[in-house]
From Swiss-Prot:
Name of the featured protein: Acetyl-coenzyme A carboxylase carboxyl transferase subunit alpha
Higher taxonomy: Bacteria, Pseudomonadati, Pseudomonadota, Alphaproteobacteria, Hyphomicrobiales
Biological process, per Gene Ontology: fatty acid biosynthetic process; malonyl-CoA biosynthetic process
Coiled coil: none
Catalytic activity line of the entry: N(6)-carboxybiotinyl-L-lysyl-[protein] + acetyl-CoA = N(6)-biotinyl-L-lysyl-[protein] + malonyl-CoA
Primary localization: cytoplasm
Gene name, Swiss-Prot/TrEMBL: accA
Top-level EC class: transferase
């Protein structure tokens, strides 16, 4: 069953009428019903197109968090063959919020790392809603080092509200683990590609996203802190999240303009949650293109290009 966001209410009402007419048409199949159904479908498509053509940053935040948006496991199942996950950080334990392993992508070995939020109550609890603890980031570092040793490119699929802020995570060195992850990304001699799938939240995202190429889905967000957290800090009022989202420049369109990301991956009309398979294909094609552009670079060139990319951020604003 499709889940609608608050601002999608006009479209929801139209699609409810369409469903009613489809049921009636299946029973009676009269020309009048068929004609009305065609008109309503066209009206709903136009309404959806107009709505998504002018989304505010706060509305994009809601789309990025949509419960039916495709997650890490969907993309891995969609275009990674023979994926073999590895567990544990060899220091404390395993963290299910970050999944990582090796597989085949278009006939080439690849290391895939990313946050998994979960799709239902049980899986969300298992994966801690994609909020990783230090052992998750240390596991990611271990995988990146393995990939570097064997000359395998790294693909990071980012979807997290941030690193887990619990006391246990702080006790085990959350900040250090995030810093080590960021350093590992920047130090790799193999190409690395990051895709911001939904939320790219703070250090929890950057720890696996400091890559040669950063791709971002059209309605994803990438931010130093959630709009709610920023509103609480700036105005001591979390209800001003909409104002914070507008001020923070968190959308793919703004971040492309500022040179923070390299390419926007288009989503189907109405967002990735309406057509996961098309979204997965679009991400796959974008990753193929990005890897192709880096494939012939030597390890030193890969590091140099990545270094220049990040050092150049902010110089041309």
């Amino acid at each position: 069953m499709r889940s609608y966001l608050d601002f999608e209410k006009p479209v929801a009402e139209l699609e409810a009428k369409i469903d009613e007419l489809r049921t009636l048409n299946a029973q009676e199949d009269t020309p009048a019903i068929g004609e009305e159904l065609t008109k309503l479908e066209a009206k709903a498509q136009k309404a959806l197109g107009d709505l998504y053509a002018s989304l505010t940053p706060w509305q994009k935040t809601q789309v990025a968090r949509h419960p039916q948006r495709p997650h890490f496991v969907d993309f891995v199942q969609g275009f990674i063959d023979d994926f073999t996950p590895l567990s544990g950080d060899r220091k404390f334990g395993d963290d299910a919020a970050i999944i990582g392993g090796f597989g085949w992508f278009e006939g080439q070995s690849i290391c895939v790392i990313g946050q998994e939020k979960g799709a239902d109550t049980e899986s969300r609890i298992k994966h801690n809603f994609g909020l990783a603890r230090p052992e998750g980031y240390r596991k990611a570092v271990r995988l990146m080092e393995l990939a570097d040793r064997f000359g395998v490119p790294v693909l990071s699929l980012v979807d997290t509200a941030g690193a887990f802020p619990g006391v246990d995570a702080e006790e085990r060195g959350q900040a250090e683990a995030i810093a080590r992850g960021t350093d590992a990304c920047l130090s790799l001699g193999v190409p690395n590609i990051a895709v911001i799938l939904g939320e790219g939240g703070s250090g929890g995202a950057i720890a696996i996203a400091a890559c040669n190429t950063v791709l971002m889905l059209e309605n994803a967000i990438y931010t130093v802190a959630s709009p709610e957290a920023s509103a609480s800090i700036l105005w001591r009022d979390a209800t001003r999240a909409q104002d914070a989202a507008m001020s923070m420049k968190i959308t793919a369109q703004d971040l492309l303009k500022f040179g923070i990301i390299d390419k926007i991956v288009p989503e189907p009309l109405g967002g990735a949650h309406r057509d996961s398979s098309t979204t997965i294909v679009a991400v796959k094609e974008a990753v193929v293109e990005a890897l192709g552009a880096l494939r012939d670079l030597s390890p030193s060139e890969v590091r140099r290009v990545r270094r220049e990319k990040f050092l150049g951020m902010g110089r041309k604003l």
